[in-house]
Structures are given as C-alpha cells and as structure tokens.
Amino acid sequence: AQFIVANCGSDEVARMCNLYQIPYAPGCTTMTEANHSLEMGAAFIKCFPISNVYGPELVNLFKTPTPWMPLMASGGINLDNLAEWLERGVDCCGMGSLLTKGSKEEIAANAAKVRAIIDETRAKMQTA
C-alpha cells in the first residue's frame, strides 16, 4: 500500500505501518484519540465523519490547541465545499465517489476540477 486511511485508530495497524514506512491516517473524533494516534506515528488525522455530523467544529477542536496537527477531512467532501474545508485548515481531503465512479473521462474531469480548486484555494490563502 502507498498509504492507509482508516475509519478508526488501531495500535496494531499503526505499528505495521511504521514498520513498513506506510503513511497512516486513522479516523478520530476526539483530541484524546488524535493525540494517541500521533503518538503511535500517524502521518495525519482523519476527521471523520466531518461534513454531515461534526462539520467545521471538529477542525476547530483539533486545530485550536494544536495548530500543527495534520488533518484530513473525510465524509461528504465535494466540489462545492472542498475550498471551504481547505480554508478551515485541513491539509488534505478524502473523496470517494467523486473520484471513483463514472467513466474514466468523468473521473479525469473531476480530478482536474479538484486540482484546480486546490491550486486556487492555496494561492488565495498564501496571498491573504
């Protein structure tokens, strides 16, 4: 595997990923879970489910006391809200069906749109 994204933390998975130097992103919804996962060597913390359950408050929960914490937003991220999540401070976003369903042309077009949104948002954030 190039990286592993999970719905929850697992010390066993973290140890295996560390052994083979595979970036690991466990799903966390509390600061305790996130801190433990980072202590176990997680590359970043997957905030999950973010959009329809916790929303931006989960990003605030993690980033306010620990602004350096690497976060991945996952669950309900789409072309309409991707920029908002990046602006809120997440480092990356997980997307499912947007980049896996449809023809290869549709997937390629969606990937290009995602890339453009990321580039535009990061450029705007650097000049702000």
Model regions and ranges:
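Glycine-rich phosphate-binding active-site loops on the catalytic face of alpha/beta enzymes
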Residues: 8-13, 46-55, 88-110
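C-terminal helical cap(s) of enzyme catalytic domains, especially alpha/beta-barrels
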Residues: 18-19, 86, 101-128
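Short, surface-exposed connector motifs at secondary-structure boundaries
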Residues: 15-20, 39-44, 64-67
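Catalytic cores of alpha/beta
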Residues: 32-40, 57, 64, 77-93
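Catalytic beta/alpha-barrel core
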Residues: 1-9, 22-35, 43-51, 72
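Short beta-strand-to-loop elements that line the ligand-binding cleft
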Residues: 27, 75, 98
